[in-house]
Amino acid sequence: MLEVVHLTKIYKAKGGVETKALNDVSVRFPEKGMVFLLGKSGSGKSTLLNVCGGLDSPTSGEIIVKGRSSKNFSQSDFDSYRNTFIGFVFQEYNILNEFTVEDNIALALELQGKPKDKKAIRQLLDDVDLSSFAKRKPNTLSGGQKQRIAIARALIKHPEIIMADEPTGALDSATGK
């Protein structure tokens, strides 16, 4: 389903100093189940997720999605991959404060070219215990509530894979479970 082969990512600072965030990483992710990446801060976990998710480009190596190399992806292929195949939950929520909670979730559907599904959005808001906040703006919510919006936004797309970078970091212990 998803595999990375000999993936290397090097960042170049303005002074010309290179930082190798990923060094010849190869991983085959299972079709089902959960995979957890563990490591110290700065060890490349977030970089790996960003590259696997098509949000950043590798310096070398390739990503293989359902047997097809990302080296052969057009921009349209990458857009489709990010909007339908992958769901993201980041450490930073990337919630739009100008939108209501429900409109932040609906945005994921809009990016897929799908209509706003109010019933599905209401169900997800109920699932993440945010039903009473549907019409509120995110800037009035706690960090944990914003994180739950991000989780609901990833789930509404029904992606084949959800990539989460510390998705429970802002949640209290009861909600995180």
What residue spans do the PLM features occupy?
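ABC family nucleotide-binding domain
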Residues: L2, L7-K177
